[in-house]
From Swiss-Prot:
One of its GO terms (cellular component) is nucleus. Transcription factor that acts as a blue light sensor. Plays crucial roles in fungal growth and asexual development. Involved in conidiophore formation, sclerotium production, and conidial stress tolerance. Promotes conidiation by inducing the expression of brlA and abaA. Positively regulates the fungal pathogenicity towards maize. In blue light conditions, inhibits aflatoxin B1 (AFB1) biosynthesis by down-regulating the expression of key genes such as aflA, aflJ, aflH, aflO and aflK. It holds the Pfam family GATA. Disruption phenotype: Reduces the number of conidia. Increases sensitivity of conidia against thermal and oxidative stresses. Decreases the expression of brlA and abaA involved in conidiation and increases the expression of aflA, aflJ, aflH, aflO and aflK, and subsequent production of AFB1, under blue light irradiation. Residues 306-328, 479-542, 608-642 form the PAS domain. It comes from the Eukaryota. This is Blue light receptor lreA. It comes from Aspergillus flavus.
Length: 857
């Protein structure tokens, strides 16, 4: 049997020492034993010189159900009464059928003291052991006889027959040498093969020849001899151990020594088998074994605590088993390891955590990427796969969560499944242990103190015109200490060497807290790879700009932009000096409330500063206003409007975080004015919060068709707001925007819609890389643009076919049917011939000049 060798028996089987004679009760099969073992007993043996302990080791005591005695029932164990001389040890013989020689497997037999009642071979003089008095040992041996019971183990004594029949034994307390108890020899315990007179071979043999052959085979010299068969226990049948505190009932006969091989008491192999063999799997996770980083959560308990954690998970997170077991998995969602139930997530994506919660409630499978934090605050991108399993019931009882760090092991993703999930190789043969740095490791106390106070800075600035003073030498230090941007220096390995005092205001960290740490401690785990790659790719003093997400100490992640260059030395690049500032991104959740009727193809969108300076304008400015977008960047939007005072008033309201809509006229490049309606939105905040920039939505209402000039001068009847009148709209009410009532009802039916941002790709806590998201958006835009172009081309072809098959046109004025070109008339359709159309256009133009206003024609 595998797993049992000479070293196992040599270390586990022990024989107590004794010099008195023990008379066992004789059984019905004693005459067989007496006929088969006719050898003499040694005359003398030292009771205190045994080489084996009289107490069994703890391992055997804990697993006694798998250790079996090798003697048969009724064999009298006659202990020697006198010690045997040492010079006679080499001439002793051993019986290969009844004695176990630990060194016989190596090709040699060890001189041992032979005992007719002892089934184990040992040498009393090889390795001296601490002596024990005879009286103490006799008392201990007598006590063991009264308290222990060793059931008999019948076997077939033919060595050619495999040892296939085993008996179920009771617990063995402190010794293997005990008299058999006949009360336990019941019918149910009787084996299928017992001692009898029938030979084990296929042909009959006389009993005398068989006994003589056994005696001849038993006598052997102490030199090298052929190895004999070892008496080995039967392999126990594999059964699942109980899972405390809710054990799983094992099928078949149970053992009182179950789960003695598992320190945790969990049948983890059974758990992984349930994961692999689960019915109707939704996610193909690939191969899993004990090298995976995973946890086991009990969803029947309150707050779904972790009840088992793998060793790889401890190495991945830096937390120990004592710190993990009993907690909910959400403790990894905070840098400090403390996240209360139901609180809003600041450092992770709240939408992803909501999906995880709903998945647990629905008892379904999920795979999602989420920012987690190791012990000490180190972030990492965790790809989580959660799978529910049943355990001895029809209801789901456990959730198995597998984790893998996508940044450190990007090759773990083997392939993409058709349903959007990924097949992950969770096996980690060499997962390094995350070492938590001590708090004082980085506190080298560099020169980060502020040199100049506010009064000293004022003195320096006032004395700049005085050439006799040397204050000009301190201007660089004054600039570094008082700028709003973070001036920082990075080493080639990405370690912070210096941070300006503005770090307290922008990132909420003290400069000394970050100096000595790497950029990965505060950078988004999905952005650290591209950032370091871009910085190291530059080998000259050319400026480099990087945009990434950085974690503030208390407020979560923000977008951050750094611009700088390398400082070169004699050996190349020494460090990089950068200037960083927060990068405010769009937060246009309220744009989702704009109805379909409020958007048009001719709308112009612009990004404005809080004072009205155009920072960006869409390409629709060229066909609508006749101006290139680059021409308008840097100019004031108020200069293009007819009412500058009303525009200033609207900007003042928009700076408070309110949404403002007003009507005005905007100047075309050719000089004429176009009626327009502008809505100012807060750019990077929700309504009610002061923004950093504004977003302007400029729409151009369509004038009513027809040649009535008086109607063209009036505002459109369906406009919600009057000309030059400012309307403030509260945060909770946007009744002036079409489609709001319908959206409000939808939000009431599904509250999750309110949490979805307009641009989900710009959420700072989003787990994916923003570069990848940008490339995907570009691909989607190209696909949509190509699809739109195909539809427009198909529409033109359809119109061309319809025009060829339509009835012949005739001029609405002269009724002619032949003309080189059809022109628009008073109806707005091309129903005038070339000459009539030119005359009508000239009349309209002359009438417009008389009225003193421009005309679209």
């Amino acid at each position: 049997m595998e797993g049992f060798s000479d070293g196992y028996y040599d270390a586990q089987y022990t024989v107590p020492a004794s010099d008195h004679r023990v008379e066992y009760p004789l059984s019905s099969s004693d005459h067989y034993a007496q006929a088969m073992m006719p050898f003499a007993t040694p005359d003398q043996m030292h009771a205190a010189g045994f080489a084996y302990q009289s107490q069994i080791p703890d391992l055997v005591a804990n697993s006694a159900s798998f250790v079996f005695p090798s003697h048969t029932a009724g064999l009298s164990l006659n202990l020697p009464e006198h010690p045997m001389p040492a010079e006679n040890l080499g001439d002793r013989t051993s019986n290969a059928m009844l004695l176990y020689d630990p060194l016989s497997a190596l090709g040699g037999s060890t001189p041992t003291a032979i005992n007719t009642g002892d089934p184990f071979a040992y040498n009393a003089f090889q390795s001296p052991f601490p002596a024990m008095s005879l009286e103490n040992f006799q008392g201990q041996q007598s006590l063991s006889f009264h308290n222990t019971c060793l059931p008999s183990q019948p076997m077939n004594l033919n060595p050619s027959v495999a040892y296939s029949t085993m008996q179920t034994h009771g617990p063995i307390l402190n010794t293997y040498q005990a008299p058999p108890r006949h009360a336990e020899l019941t019918t149910s315990a009787k084996p299928t093969g017992t001692l009898d007179k029938q030979p084990s071979t296929n042909f009959p043999q006389p009993a005398g020849q068989t006994s003589q052959r056994r005696r001849n085979r038993g006598f052997q010299s102490s030199g090298p001899t052929p190895t004999h068969r070892f008496i080995q226990p039967k392999r126990p049948s594999p059964t699942k151990a109980p899972l405390p505190p809710h054990p799983k009932s094992a099928a078949g006969e149970t053992s009182q020594y179950a789960s003695i091989y598992s320190s945790s008491g969990f049948d983890i192999m059974g758990v992984l088998a349930e994961v692999v063999s689960r019915p109707n799997p939704k996610i193909n996770i690939g191969a899993v074994d004990l090298s995976c980083a995973f946890v086991l959560c009990d969803i029947t308990q309150n707050d779904h605590p972790i009840i088992y954690v793998s060793e790889a998970f401890e190495r991945l997170t830096g937390y120990t088993e004592q710190e993990i077991v009993g907690q909910n998995c959400r403790f990894l969602q905070g840098p400090e390891g403390v996240v209360q139930k139901g609180m809003k997530r600041t450092f992770v994506d709240d939408e992803t955590t909501s999906r995880l919660r709903s998945t647990i409630e629905d008892r379904t499978e999920i795979q999602a990427s989420l920012i987690n934090y190791r012990k000490g605050g180190q972030p990492f991108m965790n790809l989580i796969t959660m799978i529910p399993i049943r355990w001895s019931s029809q209801e789901y009882r456990f959730y198995v969560g597998f984790q893998v760090d996508l940044v450190e092991t990007p090759d773990a993703v083997t392939r993409r499944n058709p349903n959007g999930t990924y097949t992950i190789n969770y096996q980690r043969s060499r997962l390094p242990n995350y070492v938590v740095p001590p708090p004082d490791l980085y506190r080298s106390h560099p020169d980060l103190t502020t040199w100049f106070t506010t009064d000293q800075v004022s003195t320096i600035l006032k004395s700049l015109n005085n050439s006799t003073l040397t204050y000009r030498n301190y201007l660089d230090r004054v600039l570094v200490e008082n700028t709003d941007d973070i001036i920082h220096a990075l080493s080639l390995e990405g370690e912070f060497l210096y941070l300006s005092p503005s770090c307290r205001k922008v990132l909420e960290y003290e400069p000394i807290e970050l100096v000595g740490k790497t950029l990965s401690t505060v950078c988004h785990p999905s952005d650290i790879g591209p950032v370091i790659r871009d910085l190291r790719a530059c080998t000259t003093t050319d400026p480099v700009s990087v945009v990434f997400r950085i974690r503030k100490k208390y407020s979560g992640y923000i977008w951050f932009e750094s611009h700088g260059s390398w400082r070169m030395g004699e050996r190349g690049r020494q460090f990089m000096v950068l200037v960083g500032r927060p990068r405010f991104v769009y937060c246009l959740d309220h744009i989702a409330s704009i109805g379909h009727g409020s958007l048009a193809e001719t709308d112009v969108w612009a990004k404005l500063s809080k004072s009205g300076i155009v920072l960006f304008m869409t390409s629709k400015a060229r066909p609508v206003l006749g101006r290139m977008p680059d021409e308008l960047i840097g100019k004031s939007l108020q200069d293009l409007m007819d009412s500058r005072a009303e525009a200033q008033k609207a900007l003042g309201v928009a700076r408070t975080g309110q949404r403002v809509t007003f009507s005005h006229k905007i100047r075309h490049k050719k000089g004429h004015m176009l009626p327009a309606q502008t809505t100012l939105h807060p750019g990077d905040t929700k309504e009610g919060v002061r923004p950093s920039f504004l977003v302007a939505h400029i729409s151009f209402p369509k004038p009513p068709q027809g040649g009535n000039d008086e109607l063209n001068s009036a505002p459109p009847p369906n406009r919600n707001l009057a000309v030059s009148k400012i309307h403030r709209q509260a945060v909770s009410g946007v009744s002036g925007v079409a489609g709001q009532n319908m959206l409000a009802s939808v939000k009431q039916a599904n509250p999750q819609i309110q949490k979805l941002p307009f641009f989900t790709e710009l959420v700072p806590t989003r787990g994916s890389s923003w570069q990848v998201e940008l490339r995907e958006l570009e691909k989607q835009n190209r696909t949509l643009s190509d699809e739109l172009q195909k539809l427009l081309t198909r529409r033109k072809k359809r119109k061309r076919k319809q025009s060829t098959a339509s009835v012949e046109k005739s001029c609405a004025i002269c009724q002619t049917k032949k003309t080189p070109e059809w022109r628009r008339g008073p109806s707005g359709e091309r129903d005038l011939c070339n000459s009539c159309g030119l005359r009508w256009a000239k009349q309209v133009r002359n009438a417009a000049q008389v009225a003193g206003r421009p005309n679209a024609y």
